[in-house]
Amino acid sequence: MEGIRRQEIRASVIAGAAAEQNVWTRSAYRNDGSNTFIVISSGHVSNSNAQNGNRCAPDRTGASPTEACGTAAERGETGAGSRDPEPERADQCRGDADAAGTRSAAVRPGPEPKLEPGELNGVVGFLALRESARECRHGVMWKDSTASYMLNLSERTLAMSRKLQDGTFRCGKTREFDITRPKRRTIVSVGFADRVFQRSLNDNSIYPRMVHGFVKDNAACQKDKGTDYARERLKEFMRRHYRRHGPNGWVCQIDVAGYYPNMRHDVAEAAFARKLPPEIMAMATAVMRNQYPGEVGYNPGSQMIQIAGISVLDPLDHMAKDLMGIRNYIRYMDDAVAILPTREEAERAMAAFGDTLHTLGFELNPKKSRVYPLRDGIEFLGFDFHLTDTGKALMFVKPSNVKDMRRRIRRMARLAQTGKMYRSEVDGSYQGWRDHASKGDSFGLIRRSDAWYKGLWKE
């Protein structure tokens, strides 16, 4: 196939590794196959775009991916059934832009995934789609499209199920809009019928298959995980480091430059292809290529892209945990923190992380990726973490967060005082920030903020 060349790539992503290792076989959460759409900080399922940790549902933007890499058996080559103990090599997905030598990280170890009995019917069957519609309606029943679909639920579900089974179902058009908090980004919204199908596909097949084999400290967008989980794990790592090495240590913190905008479609599809059977993979690629044309980049808005977001960097997690043996490592989407005893180890980790990201088509964000002393504190997921001389891990709200809150609440209070907004809306917004601050060691800050908030209404 034009644009696809065979090239052996090493399973070990550490330069100079003495032996190749299959780093995808470990399963930290073997029983964590529960369905989920999007999780808030506590890990509970939530359809509300405003209530999850990213302030938006998943993602969108891009280009049509190149063909996914196949196994030797799929290509009809001899030796596909060999019992040779050496790990199976993968084809390399390379388009015209890859001629310069950019390597694909698409390695599919082991046999091709197979459908479980009843799995396909559990995705496109009537009962599965009906349950998916009932889950998707939460928080959006005020929309005409949702109300119309639910009013004719049985008829619409039966029609969709038949189209999916005979191959005539087509995804609808998407709609783009911008959000400004917590940072400016473009969101892609899909129609309610498409959401019903995609949720059934993701919840009943893609999500449970993809999370199988994740390391425990891949913390984003999974059941029983989330921002609260990631923060508590980081605090535990700081205490563990103190018990072994005292208060002195070094932090290797990385951030991927433009994670979703720079995500290559062939890499995202290859991550899915390693774990999804061909029937499910065909539906997944149809959705992704319809919603995200091009070859590079996604924008938030799709549940499937959020799953891709937590899956694409799985090789990085296994390199850190399994190959390098870094126990004190946590990753939340594209932000990762590793705590190490010496500066030399932290710098080696930074170099290895950068090399691995490069093979996946990413680069480190030079402003946010750095090696620094543990005593300086760690900024992670909206809080500043500090380790005391007695080994206690403290978590404080970032000062910039407090400043933004006061500016926003002050503006809302003025609108309420002029009759342009209900005070209950202002109270709700302040209470939301207060709940966020209460997750940290913020007793004094909350007491001062409460006094400040009461004073707003006396002006």
What are the functions of these language-model segments?
Residues E2-G70:
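C-terminal, surface-exposed recognition/capping segments
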Residues E67-L158:
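Non-catalytic, polymerase-adjacent accessory regions of viral genome-replication enzymes
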Residues C69-C93, A97-R103, V190-G191, R195, ...:
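Right-hand nucleic-acid polymerase module
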Residues E116-E119, N202-P261:
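Active-site-proximal segment of RNA-dependent polymerases
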Residues K163, G167, E232-M333, V337-G354, ...:
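Conserved polymerase palm-domain catalytic core
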Residues K173:
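Extended, charge-enriched "interface" segments that sit outside catalytic cores
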Residues R184-V215, E295-K321:
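Conserved pre-motif C helix in the palm subdomain of viral-like polymerases
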